[in-house]
């Protein structure tokens, strides 16, 4: 397969995800397929965003990493010290992705490390490993292109997260401001009673304890639910199950006391 064909295969995958979050596992599998390598896409804090490995590479240590979705902190630091592409790293180098304890098996292995950059900052690392065969110039061009594309996707996800947080904060503020004094007081007591983000509420019990009518509680919950801040489900005589949908709600409620 030519370099152009391999690049197009990567582009096809990204076009398929246009407008929705990219699955980095899919990206890793595509990179693995077109470069014939083992692939790790790692965040700057060492979280494994996506991977695609040959069964031969899976040792106990590698399996533990995949299960925890994190690489060891020491290896993360080594990767973050790499400022530009380092290619054809051998098994004796501490940057190798292959387990040194299996040195005899991977004596001909080669690792290449591509820093993932975006918006003027380091976002993570793309690590490719081959059991044998050096990385050639085409491999490096493709790897650097893949790292650039991954960086753009990470930035897009970050931007989407910031936008979502802003929308959630606005919805929470509007919902709290829509409550009357007694409704706000009722909500504060409800979440004190629940002691967390979700739980079972018996409205009459809270109403009696606080000295407000049950209708105040019902109206307060209805306002929060219509704003998308909470969800509630009646369980009949058992009470009402309540769950917070926007995670910053309780912090904002506390701040508005």
UniProtKB/Swiss-Prot annotation:
Residue range(s) of DNA binding per entry: 203-222
Listed GO MF terms: DNA binding; DNA-binding transcription factor activity; GTP binding
GO biological process: negative regulation of DNA-templated transcription
InterPro entries in UniProt: CodY, GAF-like_dom_sf, GTP_trans_reg_CodY_C, Transc_reg_CodY_N, WH-like_DNA-bd_sf, WH_DNA-bd_sf
Record function comment: DNA-binding global transcriptional regulator which is involved in the adaptive response to starvation and acts by directly or indirectly controlling the expression of numerous genes in response to nutrient availability. During rapid exponential growth, CodY is highly active and represses genes whose products allow adaptation to nutrient depletion.
Protein family per UniProt: Belongs to the CodY family.
Coiled coil (residue ranges): none
One Gene Ontology cellular component annotation held by this UniProt entry: cytoplasm
Segments of this protein annotated with the region GAF domain: 1-155
Protein name: Global transcriptional regulator CodY
Compartment(s) of residence: Cytoplasm
This protein's UniProt keywords: Cytoplasm, DNA-binding, Repressor, Transcription, Transcription regulation
């Amino acid at each position: 397969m030519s370099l152009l064909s391999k690049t197009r295969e990567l582009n096809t995958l990204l076009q398929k995800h246009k407008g929705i979050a990219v699955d980095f596992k899919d990206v890793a599998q595509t990179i693995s397929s077109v470069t014939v390598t083992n692939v790790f896409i790692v965040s700057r804090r060492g979280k494994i965003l996506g991977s695609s490995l040959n069964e031969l590479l899976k040792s106990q240590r590698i399996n533990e990493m995949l299960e925890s979705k994190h690489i060891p902190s020491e290896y993360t630091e080594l990767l973050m010290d790499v400022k530009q592409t380092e290619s054809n790293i051998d098994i004796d180098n501490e940057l190798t992705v292959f387990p040194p304890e299996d040195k005899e098996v991977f004596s001909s292995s080669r690792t290449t490390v591509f820093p993932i950059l975006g918006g003027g900052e380091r976002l993570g690392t793309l690590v490719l490993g081959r059991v044998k065969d050096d990385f050639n110039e085409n491999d490096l061009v493709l790897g650097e292109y893949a790292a650039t594309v991954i960086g753009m996707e990470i930035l897009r996800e970050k931007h989407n997260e910031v936008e979502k947080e802003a929308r959630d904060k606005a919805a929470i503020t509007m919902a709290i401001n829509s409550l009357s004094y007694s409704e706000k007081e009722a909500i504060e007591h409800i979440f004190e009673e629940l002691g967390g983000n979700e739980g079972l509420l018996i409205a009459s019990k809270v109403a009696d304890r606080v000295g407000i009518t049950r209708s105040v509680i019902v109206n307060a919950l209805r306002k929060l639910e219509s704003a998308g801040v909470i969800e509630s489900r009646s369980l009949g005589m058992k009470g009402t199950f309540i769950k917070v949908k926007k995670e910053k709600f309780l912090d904002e409620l506390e701040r508005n006391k």
